[in-house]
C-alpha cells in the first residue's frame, strides 16, 4: 500500500497519544506533523510519554498546512476546534478524518456540500470502535421489531459534550425504522426536572459522566414479556485504533463526506 502522510491534531490527548503509537507501528503511515496550540515549535519527542519521533509540532493548522505536505488530517481535538479544522482542511483540499463530535445537522450539511464541491474525502466518525458501530447497527435492526427503546450512554467525566455522538447517531439509525411515539404513561410527570433524560421522538437518552469510565453504551428495547439489551464497552483508547486505521486508509479513495464508520464498513 502506498504511504499515507498524516497530520495529527490533538496529539497530547489520550486518543491522540494512541494515534501517535498507531503511526509508529503502521509501516504505510507517515506521521509528518502535529498540531498543538501549547507546544508549537517543539517535536513530538519533546512531549512527556511520547515515542522518540522527530515530528514537528505546529501551533495552528493554518501554518502547518502552509509548510507541510500531507494526505490526511486526523483531528482528535475538541468539538469547537474540530469544526474549525475540518472546514479549513476541506477548503485546502486536504482529506480529513474527524474523531470529534457535536456537529449539528446544519453543520454536517454545510460540510457535506463543500466536500462535494471540492471533491475532498472526509470522514466524521462519532465512534471509531468497530464493536460500537456493530452495536449501532444491531440496534437499528432491532428497532424494526421493538418500538419502545431507551439509551444509556456512559463516559469519563472529562467528556465535553452530552449526549455522546454515538448516542445521537444511534437515535438517527433507530428513527429510520421507528415512527415517533410517546413512550411510557401518557400522563407521566417528572418530579425532578430532567430525570427522564433527553427525549427525541419518544426515545429517552440518559448520559452518565464518572471517573473510571471510558466509553460505554447500552440500548434497551422493551416488549411484552421480554427485553433486549444491546451493549458495547470500550475499556481503553486502543479499542478505537482499528477504526482510525480503517478511516485513514478509506478516506484516500473518497471524494465526498461520509458520516459514521458504519458507512465505510463492508
From Swiss-Prot:
Positions with a binding annotation for (S)-2,3,4,5-tetrahydrodipicolinate: 156, 165-166
Cell compartment(s), UniProt: Cytoplasm
GO biological process: one example: lysine biosynthetic process via diaminopimelate
Gene3D superfamilies recorded: Dihydrodipicolinate Reductase, domain 2 (3.30.360.10), NAD(P)-binding Rossmann-like Domain (3.40.50.720)
Keyword Cell inner membrane: no
Residues involved in NADP(+) binding: 38
Gene Ontology, cellular component aspect: cytosol
Pathway(s) where this gene product acts: Amino-acid biosynthesis; L-lysine biosynthesis via DAP pathway; (S)-tetrahydrodipicolinate from L-aspartate: step 4/4
Record: residues binding NAD(+): 10-15, 99-101, 125-128
Catalyzed reaction equations: (S)-2,3,4,5-tetrahydrodipicolinate + NAD(+) + H2O = (2S,4S)-4-hydroxy-2,3,4,5-tetrahydrodipicolinate + NADH + H(+); (S)-2,3,4,5-tetrahydrodipicolinate + NADP(+) + H2O = (2S,4S)-4-hydroxy-2,3,4,5-tetrahydrodipicolinate + NADPH + H(+)
Job description of the protein: Catalyzes the conversion of 4-hydroxy-tetrahydrodipicolinate (HTPA) to tetrahydrodipicolinate.
Name of the molecule in the record: 4-hydroxy-tetrahydrodipicolinate reductase
The gene coding this protein: dapB
Amino acid at each position: 500500500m502506498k504511504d499515507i502522510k498524516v497530520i495529527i491534531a490533538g496529539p497530547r490527548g489520550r486518543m491522540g497519544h494512541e494515534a501517535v503509537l498507531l503511526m509508529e507501528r503502521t509501516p504505510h503511515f507517515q506521521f509528518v506533523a502535529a498540531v498543538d496550540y501549547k507546544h508549537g515549535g517543539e517535536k513530538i519527542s519533546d512531549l512527556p510519554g511520547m515515542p522518540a519521533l522527530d515530528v514537528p509540532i505546529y501551533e495552528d493548522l493554518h501554518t502547518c498546512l502552509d509548510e507541510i505536505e500531507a494526505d490526511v488530517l486526523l483531528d482528535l481535538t475538541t468539538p469547537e476546534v474540530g469544526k474549525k479544522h475540518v472546514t479549513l482542511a476541506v477548503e485546502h483540499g486536504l482529506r480529513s478524518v474527524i474523531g470529534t463530535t457535536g456537529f449539528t445537522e446544519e453543520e454536517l450539511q454545510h460540510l457535506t456540500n463543500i466536500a462535494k464541491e471540492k471533491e475532498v474525502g472526509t470522514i466524521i466518525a462519532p465512534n471509531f470502535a468497530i464493536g460500537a458501530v456493530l452495536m449501532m447497527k444491531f440496534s437499528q435492526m432491532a428497532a424494526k421489531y421493538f418500538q419502545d427503546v431507551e439509551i444509556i450512554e456512559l463516559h469519563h467525566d472529562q467528556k465535553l459534550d452530552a449526549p455522546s455522538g454515538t448516542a445521537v447517531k444511534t437515535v438517527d439509525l433507530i428513527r429510520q425504522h421507528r415512527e415517533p411515539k410517546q413512550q411510557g404513561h401518557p400522563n407521566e410527570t417528572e418530579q425532578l426536572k430532567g430525570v427522564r433524560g433527553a427525549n427525541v421522538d419518544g426515545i429517552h437518552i440518559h448520559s452518565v459522566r464518572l471517573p473510571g469510565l471510558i466509553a460505554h453504551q447500552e440500548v434497551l428495547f422493551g416488549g411484552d414479556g421480554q427485553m433486549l439489551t444491546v451493549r458495547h464497552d470500550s475499556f481503553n483508547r486502543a479499542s478505537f485504533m482499528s477504526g482510525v486505521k480503517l478511516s485513514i486508509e478509506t478516506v484516500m479513495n473518497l471524494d465526498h463526506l461520509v458520516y459514521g464508520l458504519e458507512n465505510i464498513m463492508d
